[in-house]
A protein has these predicted regions:
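Short, Lys/Arg-rich flexible segments
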Residues: 1-172
Length: 172
């Protein structure tokens, strides 16, 4: 086996295995064993990172030379993966107000705990809508791709397996 083929096997195996592992992070709601931070208010529409599945489906992996690279086509992937701050815009404020009115509309006619849950959500949107344009909004880190001890373990396992396969092919 040529070295180029050997390296290609390792890179391809790494791409497949790690892409599957990174995808499972969305199901685990964690970066391997590091749980994601909870949202400030519980949401009735499911997990923050799984509501639409757009971010999860946007992840692509490519082999570039001697490396495997993961990318996403959605603009918010980096801030979700690494955390950070975003500046509130007028457009965001309009969205927050729309979500507030939607939440208070959904609360009408409900009683007890259901009404309280919608009220908490409505108050959250109202608080965001009342923030000034230019204020910073902190986005908590919810890493789904990157370096981790589990990634290192998987890569080592892949390399060891491919070395053993190559040695077995030499001895035949």
């Amino acid at each position: 086996m040529e070295f180029k083929d050997f390296l290609n096997h390792i890179l391809t195996d790494t791409k497949v295995k790690l892409t599957e592992a990174f995808d499972r992070n969305f199901e685990r709601k964690a970066f391997f064993d590091d749980k994601w931070a909870n949202t400030l208010i519980p949401n009735r529409r499911g997990s923050l990172m799984m509501r639409t599945g757009t971010l999860r489906r946007s992840i692509r992996s490519n082999i570039e030379g001697t490396t495997v690279r993961w990318t996403s086509s959605v603009p918010y992937a980096d801030i979700q993966n690494n955390g950070g701050e975003v500046e509130i815009t007028a457009k965001m404020k309009r969205y927050f107000w729309a979500m507030y009115y939607k939440a208070i509309g959904a609360a009408k006619g409900r009683k007890g705990a259901a009404k309280k849950a919608f009220s908490v959500e409505a108050e959250h949107w109202k608080a965001l809508a009342l923030k000034q344009v230019g204020n910073k909004l902190k986005i908590l880190k919810r890493q789904f791709i990157g370096n981790h001890t589990e990634v290192k373990r998987m890569v080592t396992e892949i390399v060891d397996f491919n070395i053993k396969e190559a040695l077995n092919n030499i001895h035949q």
